[in-house]
Amino acid sequence: NKANLMNELGKIDRIIKREISEAPQETLLVLDATTGQNAITQAKVFLETAHVTGVVLTKLDGTAKGGVVIAIKEELGLPVKWIGIGEGQMDFRPFEPEKFVDALFETKAAPQEA
């Protein structure tokens, strides 16, 4: 069940910190951008168990505008580090906040009449 899985995740996190404490450690939570506010709820559950250092936000190539990016930062204080814009491994990109904001407010130009 969910509680057992979360306990296992916490155990893995503790063991890694104990065994290789001197190594840099990054724990990224992968969230689906199309789930909206539910992504925040999911992240809160993971934050109770593991030391999450950032987020990978997938499915930003679809209809989702990714407004959850702002909520992730504001409500949880987590940076979005990577985004997925397709289905392949080469479709992951570093998250660039400036480009993201530009894309949110981008409008398609109306066709010019001849």
What is each of the regions a protein language model found here?
Residues 1-114:
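P-loop/Walker A NTP-binding module and the surrounding RecA-like catalytic core of P-loop NTPases
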